[in-house]
Amino acid sequence: MSVREKMLEILEGIDIRFKEPLHSYSYTKVGGEADYLVFPRNRFELARVVKFANQENIPWMVLGNASNIIVRDGGIRGFVILCDKLNNVSVDGYTIEAEAGANLIETTRIALRHSLTGFEFACGIPGSVGGAVFMNAGAYGGEIAHILQSCKVLTKDGEIETLSAKDLAFGYRHSAIQESGAVVLSVKFALAPGTHQVIKQEMDRLTHLRELKQPLEYPSCGSVFKRPVGHFAGQLISEAGLKGYRIGGVEVSEKHAGFMINVADGTAKDYEDLIQSVIEKVKEHSGITLEREVRILGESK
C-alpha cells in the first residue's frame, strides 16, 4: 500500500489536498506547493494527522493562517496544516476562550460586543489566535503576553497539555512554542470589564492609525523586521533611502518602510533577495543589523 493510499484510509473524512499551491493561502500571494495541505475540523482530526505523520516519518507544520510568513517558491514537503476551521470562540464572564484558528481581529470584536477591555491593541493585527500566541503578537504597547491566561497545546508527540503564560516564556515576538514544536489548540484570555463606547473609540482610533500608516491595499507579510532596541526598523530603512526600493515584483513600501509589498507578481525569491539587500544596506548606513520577524519556510525552487 502506498503512503497516499494509507493516508486516505487512515485519515478518511479529513480534508486533504495533494500538491496544493500555497500562494492562494498566504498574505504575500507567493509560495510553491504543499505535498499535503490539510484542513482539520477539530483538535481530534488534527491529532490524527500528527499521529499519522509521526508514525510515517512525514514532516509536518502548522501555518496558522499564513499572515506573517513567506513560503518559498519550491513549496513545503510533507503536511502543511491550516487550522482556520478550528475557530470557535466563547465568552465566560471576563474570559474569552478561542480556538487556534479563530481570526484574531474577529476575536477582538467579540470582546468589544461583550464590553471587555484589554484586547484593543490587536484589533487590526491580521492572523489567527494560534499564530498570535506563537509570535506573541503585539501593537501599540500591547501584546498577547499581557492578556493570556492559559493555552492548550498538542505536543509534537501528540499529547495535550495546558500551559500558563509563565510556561510560554514570552518575549518580544517570541514564545516557547517556537522551540517546543507544539501546536496551539485553544487559548484563554483574561480581560476586564469596560465601557462599550470607550473600547470602540480606542479600536476605531487604532484602526485609523493602521490604515493611515500601513500599505493595506497590497499583498504583504506584515512587519518584516523586529524592532531594534532604541530604534524603529521602518525609520532606519527610510533613512537609508530605501523607500520604493524594488527587486523583481516586490518593493519596500513608500507608505511604511517596515513593509514589503507584492506589487507585480513577485516571488518568494524576490522577497528573500529584497530582505537580504535591505539588511545589508541598513547595516552600511547605520551600523545596525536588522533581524527578521517574518518567518521564511519551505524549499527554494
Swiss-Prot record:
Which Gene Ontology cellular component terms are annotated? cytosol
Query: Which major enzyme category is it?
Result: oxidoreductase
What gene is it encoded by? murB
The record's function comment reads: Cell wall formation.
Its Enzyme Commission number(s) read 1.3.1.98
Recorded GO MF terms:
FAD binding; UDP-N-acetylmuramate dehydrogenase activity
Q: Which HAMAP family match?
A: MurB
PANTHER family recorded: UDP-N-ACETYLENOLPYRUVOYLGLUCOSAMINE REDUCTASE
Q: Which domain of life is it from?
A: Bacteria
Q: Which PROSITE patterns does the record associate with it?
A: FAD_PCMH
Protein source organism: Streptococcus pneumoniae (strain Hungary19A-6)
Q: Which cofactor does it need?
A: FAD
Reactions catalysed according to its record: UDP-N-acetyl-alpha-D-muramate + NADP(+) = UDP-N-acetyl-3-O-(1-carboxyvinyl)-alpha-D-glucosamine + NADPH + H(+)
Q: Where in the cell is it found?
A: Cytoplasm
Task: Give the record's keywords alphabetically.
Answer: Cell cycle, Cell division, Cell shape, Cell wall biogenesis/degradation, Cytoplasm, FAD, Flavoprotein, NADP, Oxidoreductase, Peptidoglycan synthesis
- Listed GO biological process terms: cell division; cell wall organization; peptidoglycan biosynthetic process; regulation of cell shape
The protein, known as: UDP-N-acetylenolpyruvoylglucosamine reductase
Q: Which InterPro entries match?
A: FAD-bd_PCMH, FAD-bd_PCMH-like_sf, FAD-bd_PCMH_sub1, FAD-bd_PCMH_sub2, MurB, MurB_C, MurB_C_sf, Oxid_FAD_bind_N
Q: To which protein family does this belong?
A: Belongs to the MurB family.
Q: Which residues form the active site?
A: R173, S223 (proton donor), E293
Where does it primarily localize?
Answer: cytoplasm
The chain positions of domain FAD-binding PCMH-type read 30-194
Keyword Cell cycle among record annotations:
yes
Q: In which pathway does it act?
A: Cell wall biogenesis; peptidoglycan biosynthesis
